[in-house]
Amino acid sequence: MASQKGILLGFETMETPFMNTVEKSMRFVELVKSPYLQVYPDSGNLMNASLEPGAKNVYEDIELGRGHIVAAHLKETIPGHYREIPFGTGQIDFKRMVDTFLSIGVNRFTGEFWYVGQENWLEDIKFANQFLRSHFPNI
């Protein structure tokens, strides 16, 4: 149905072992074999998955999605925690993450950050915008 409307669907890499890597997402993309089903990796979820014993390096995992990534989801995390981590306070090397995605042709990005009731939410939005843009060339 989505293909009839030209809509692309992307599997977001999850917080759970079921589909927390590009490699796992690609299994379904290859099974379905539709140009309308692709991968939407979440940087934070990928990073935490890469910390599991025997896991691939996060940047090698991203490479496995070459040609099948519709956009990249930029989110900060710390080991074992996936939500409400402010940009720049966790484990993500955003420069390397962005460069890796750009190197395989990904040019669409989403930034995920959290409102947790803070009064200075507008400043948080401005900071997130500035922080993420600072990791892209020519912006």
PLM region spans:
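Short, internal active-site loops enriched in acidic
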Residues: 15-17
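Residue-level detector of anion-binding/catalytic polar loops
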Residues: 8
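An active-site-proximal structural segment forming one wall of the substrate-binding cleft
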Residues: 1-5
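Histidine-acidic metal/acid-base catalytic patches
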Residues: 19-139
